[in-house]
């Protein structure tokens, strides 16, 4: 079974039994190149539903169908930019079509599944496995934005490692690029409706890609439904060539950043402030600002530290990162009059104020009890007292440490959430379609009753509530916390035709909201937590969840994975490659200490300074503080770095840093223990160099620095005849001519 089109550079051979791909062929410079594949398709159906121990929905008594069989004649049709070949198949009792799209723009081949109406079938998941065969052991793997270092020798990948999807929390470009001296192969996990789970491994000369789509549907509700699986291309040149190619792929798919952030954002220093008190291990309280007045009284110090923006968290411990009532400012943040005064006093000092806002759900006593009871009877109940460190490992599919800390958090906050909540939210009866539900009709959630951002009426409610906050408080932006937190299925009658589409519904909501708020206030900031490309479509700024594992991997060698970063130079290369495949104009907020990194570790090891020591934290602060984009810090993280923060703020305001181009120190001249980044504009440049080792480092400079003047010294340096010498655990920032 062969598929080809005169307008496509690629031809596809299908397994005649399964209808799945077995061979890709492409003519390059007159020579026919081939890539053998082995694919399987699995469908999980029917069964029963229950709450998972850590919230959401899990299934049991399901049937897993594995026998995919071709089931009819191939048909085809053309669109403006592709020829589509439809191959009918059956997987067990489920009928569907495989769509092979030969594209004239973007990746050469895209594969999707298409379902039509079938009674009595509940699809719970769809799994697509791809084996890229006969991969040379000397091949190089790049999976930018994930937990693998750049240019990874494929034979190093002994484990199965997660790949974050386009809509993931630790999001990425979702590309898997494999290359050797003769060829390259690219797989792109390009579903941006669901949030799939993907993992890669290498064994027996095969690269294995497993895609768990998280697609779910009651097929009795379906007319015709298409689910993207994966796109392929090969012989595209080296990894260094790929970002330019991928940029055209993104634009073909309409994945783009607005690329017009407020002018104040790029050099911003963001101060994350907490009102009230948070609770850890039941007896430990953290209360930097008990009341609004305490934060107002600290504004001058905050300004002198170099901060230009305050990110105000919801009040702790209630409602914390949950919804009480969007319209009740007093309960959600603090007395409205005082919050308004905080904004006014901040504005007088040239400090912007943005609010942390929640989408995932509303608290009431019913759901709090359900969540807490689930923790007490769940798999982490005996681990709540266990010591936890950083919640993110290099492997994006490893949530073990986080789930222990999350379970402890639920028990710690349970009495405060219970005291502040109504017995049952009135919204449940007033607006039943606003919530995720089991097929039984029961509301689903993690530790709130989960809102479904796909519901158009709820979108109007949320938009109105957010506009009310702007009008009443004169704030300067929002940070949308955890908008994809409800990454499970909604089986409500109106949503069950595509039950997994709710998890990313916030992206459409944000695209509708952006012009309304920009019209109200042109320099208003849209900022969200997930790092994935799907979440960058309507955002000026994204959080750096994808970067957080780098801090621990660099500072704590015992945590490193064979396939992760192992040096400062690796970290620089990782950032460079991650940024190279972001949509143009994307911006990331960097940090080392946030409320997230503070909340999840055990008491006594919450701050990076407690984990790694102040000396190392000073290096990390300069490293992440002077990356392109804003720097943010949680209140209390300034201890031991008070002198560095104003200097970082001053450098970030320099037009060379804000408007210049980047040069990363990645050549063979630069030792592994050196982090180097230069920004240059016309004939001037600023260079940051950091020696993370405990020994003096001497090396040839990648660029001429004879004209250099120090802007910041954390340690000492010398420069003689183009040879740099940096003292142990040191950092320097130099101003100099550009070559």
Across the structure, where does each feature detected by a protein language model lie?
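Substrate-binding cleft/loops of secretory-pathway carbohydrate-active enzymes
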Residues: 363, 369-373, 525-564
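Glycan-recognition and catalytic regions of carbohydrate-active enzymes
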Residues: 527, 576, 634-686, 692
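Beta-strand-rich recognition/accessory modules
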Residues: 4, 90, 170-258
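C-terminal beta-strand-rich structural cap/linker in extracellular carbohydrate-active enzymes
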Residues: 720-739
